[in-house]
Structure formats: structure tokens, C-alpha cells
UniProtKB/Swiss-Prot annotation:
The lineage of its organism: Archaea, Methanobacteriati, Methanobacteriota, Methanomada group, Methanococci. Gene3D superfamilies: P-loop containing nucleotide triphosphate hydrolases (3.40.50.300), Winged helix-like DNA-binding domain superfamily/Winged helix DNA-binding domain (1.10.10.10). Pfam families: ATPase_2 (PF01637), MJ1010-like_2nd (PF21690). This is Uncharacterized ATP-binding protein MJ1301. PANTHER family: AAA+ ATPASE DOMAIN-CONTAINING PROTEIN, YALI0E33429P. It comes from the Archaea.
Length: 400
């Protein structure tokens, strides 16, 4: 069986780029979360900025992609953060040599003996102290450091003398709000993780959100999160469990970057068709949108397959595939728990007529279950639930 590899095409995100570049050009003050549904273009957006929009003479980017890395213990976390080297050069000398050829670094350079000491001591204090010193050296060279962590939720439940995520957020607060030393961007497609950050008393006035979701244009108000976290306090601590939907402090703004709206999706189809030396009728484009909506990766998949397949066959297969996956999912739920199955079906029936609904229309445990299974996506700031894609939505309507 062959594997179709799809490279995300970058298209029409100028408003979001302008927003992020404006943030980068200013003094570091907040932690920024870039989030959205699966395959909405978060990483493509960041890569466009890193590779084509930043001046390498002014900025040094450390990009940590946790997507394909299994992190279960302290040593795994350290290996993600650092890039070991041997020799007498200082970290800043190594960085300057590498950055001439690469737009970003995938680890912070560290001498082998120093790394060995950090492995032995197994404390984040030494890790963060070393990173801070490197970042300060970069600033002394007249450059602005930027830290980007992709799929941050992968360390959400990891413990190192308490929950690592709290240690990390406290450190990021120090880098941004206190020292104004480094810009920090965290990417996540896990809307439950974002909801936990949003609802559980973290990072008051220290964080802002950038929503990579349906591309509807424009800006919307952003809502900060309540009090500063304490290291070692677990998610779900009863002392932290209070609702913060109505915040007293509303500062900053976030950008809607999501799956393309219809107008942008149709333009994207034209763009891809031109690249592939093919033509699409208005009826073709309407049909594609009705099946897959504005999900960039699905539009790319359709256009790519048009080189050797009929459009109706492509779309019918994609819908059948999504429908069968949903049917088998529901079958598994029913066999495991009949009562849960009934509640899940009742919840999904709410999407028979509407693509988006208010989050509290579905009981918390049921919506979290469906979000974890990548059936639904939650925007906790707007309080909106929707299927992960038009394709999933069409499958829901067909099955139920």
C-alpha cells in the first residue's frame, strides 16, 4: 500500500503574518498560544514566518517540534531542548556558525560535559539557568531570540518534581513579562489542553492567544488567563477549579486563522489548479467545498488526486472513508458502554443542522470524549464546538 505524502501549501495568511511579525518586532511581554483544529495550517504559518519573513541578522529562532518525539521522562525532555557539541567554542559561537546556513535551530547548543551534568542533576533549575545565559548572550550580540514549541501539549502531564508544564510556564513568564528577554510562541492542536490552560487559573495577563481556525478574516478580542501558576501544582487541583469565563482583564487580541472560509477556499483551489496545470469549473469548486470545506490539507489532497482520478470518485471515496471511520467508532463505543453510546449519538445529532454549536449544549464529559477522539474541536475562548472538518460533519449527517 502506498502512502500519500502531502506538503502543506502556504496561502493567504497575510493578516496573521502581520500580527505575529508585529509581536516579534516589539518587546517580549507575553506568552502566545497559536492553536486551531488539526491540519488548519499552524505549522505552515510559523514555517513561512521563520523561513521567509524574518531577518536572520536580527532574530535567532529556536524551534522545538514535539510532534514526532516520545517524551516520558526527564532525559527525553532534555534531549529535545539541547543539541550537544564537542570542542572549545562557546554556545554563541556555535549558534552564529549554524544560523548562517539555517533559518532556525532545533536545539540549544550545549557542550557535552555541561549536558552530562544536567542529566545527572535532573532539575529544571539548571536547565533554565543555562538557557537563560545563552539567550542573554544572544541579546548581547544585538539579536532577538525567539522560542517556538510545536505541539506543547505532549508534555502536559509529565512530572519532574511536579508537573513540568507549570515549571515551563513559570520560566516562560520570567523570559517574557519579567526579563523581556525572549519571545515565546506555543503551538497546539489539542483544544482540551488549551481549555485547561484557559480555565484553570494560569498566567494572568501573561498570555495571549492566536487562533488558527476557520479563516474568516479580521481580529477578535483576546482574553488573558487568571493568576500566575505555582510549580508542582497539578492540573485539576480543586483549589484552582473555578470558572473564568467572565474575565475582568481582557487585553490583547488573537487572530482567526482556521480552515479557510468559502471565498478563500475557492481561491486556494484556483491557486493549486494553476500550479498543477489544470482547470476547475465553478461547479467543481463548489462540489469540493461542499465535501471538504476549507481544510487546506484536504483541498490539497483532492487537487493532487485529480491528476489521475475523477473528481466525483475522489470525493465519494473520501466521504465513504470518513463515514466508515465514524461508524466503526460508534460501534466500538456501543460495545464498550451502551449508555455512553446513546449520549454520544445525542450529542452528534446536534450537528445535523448546524456546523457550530455552543459548547455547553453537550455535557462536559461527552464533549471531552469526542474532542479526544478528534471528532470535535473546541474553541474555549468563544465557547464553540464544531466537527474537526467539513468531511467529519458530512459523515455525521450521513450516519445519523
Amino acid at each position: 500500500m502506498g502512502i500519500l505524502v502531502i506538503f502543506m501549501k502556504f496561502f493567504n495568511r497575510e493578516k496573521e503574518i502581520h500580527k505575529i511579525l508585529s509581536i516579534i518586532e516589539g518587546e517580549p511581554n507575553l506568552i502566545y498560544f497559536i492553536y486551531g483544529s488539526i491540519n488548519s495550517g499552524k505549522t505552515a504559518l510559523i514555517n513561512e514566518i521563520i523561513n521567509n519573513r524574518l531577518d536572520k541578522n536580527k532574530y535567532i529562532v529556536f524551534y522545538f517540534d514535539l510532534r514526532e518525539i516520545f517524551i516520558s521522562k526527564y532525559d527525553d525532555f532534555i534531549e529535545v531542548l539541547f543539541e550537544e557539541y564537542e570542542g572549545d567554542k562557546s554556545p554563541i559561537e556555535v549558534i552564529k556558525a549554524i544560523i548562517n546556513d539555517l533559518p532556525s535551530l532545533y536545539g540549544i547548543p550545549i557542550p557535552k560535559n555541561t549536558l552530562n551534568e544536567i542529566f545527572k542533576k535532573k532539575t529544571t533549575k539548571n536547565v533554565f539557568r543555562y538557557i537563560t545565559n545563552v539567550l542573554m548572550d544572544i541579546k548581547r550580540e544585538g539579536k532577538q531570540p525567539i522560542i517556538i514549541i510545536d505541539e506543547l501539549q505532549k508534555i502536559g502531564d509529565m512530572k519532574i518534581n511536579g508537573f513540568l508544564i507549570y515549571e515551563l510556564f513559570n520560566y516562560f513568564v520570567s523570559l517574557t513579562k519579567h526579563k523581556h528577554l525572549c519571545h515565546v510562541f506555543c503551538l497546539s492542536s489539542d483544544s482540551l489542553f488549551i481549555e485547561r490552560v484557559y480555565n484553570e487559573a494560569m498566567l494572568e495577563d501573561r498570555v495571549d492567544y492566536i487562533l488558527v481556525d476557520d479563516h474568516r478574516g479580521g481580529y477578535a478580542p483576546s482574553i488573558g488567563i487568571l493568576p500566575q501558576i505555582e510549580s508542582g501544582v497539578a492540573f485539576g487541583n480543586p483549589a484552582l477549579e473555578y470558572s473564568n469565563r467572565g474575565f475582568a482583564s481582557m487585553r490583547g487580541e488573537y487572530i482567526l486563522v482556521d480552515d479557510f472560509d468559502k471565498e478563500t477556499a475557492l481561491k486556494f483551489m484556483d491557486f493549486l489548479a494553476k500550479e498543477n496545470n489544470m482547470s476547475l469549473t465553478n461547479e467543481d469548486k463548489e462540489l469540493i467545498y461542499n465535501y471538504v470545506g476549507g481544510k487546506p490539507v484536504l483541498i490539497i489532497k483532492v487537487i493532487d488526486k485529480l491528476r489521475y482520478e475523477n473528481l466525483n470518485d475522489i470525493l465519494d471515496f473520501m466521504l465513504k472513508d470518513a463515514t466508515q471511520k465514524l461508524k466503526y467508532f460508534l460501534e466500538d463505543v456501543k460495545e464498550e458502554d451502551e449508555e455512553l453510546y446513546k449520549k454520544v449519538v445525542d450529542a452528534l445529532k446536534l450537528f445535523k443542522e448546524d456546523y457550530e454549536i455552543e459548547d455547553i449544549k453537550i455535557p462536559k464529559k461527552i464533549r471531552e470524549f469526542l474532542i479526544k477522539r478528534n471528532i470535535l474541536f473546541l474553541n474555549p475562548i468563544e465557547g464553540i464546538l464544531k466537527p474537526q472538518s467539513f468531511l467529519v460533519w458530512n459523515a455525521i449527517k450521513k450516519v445519523l
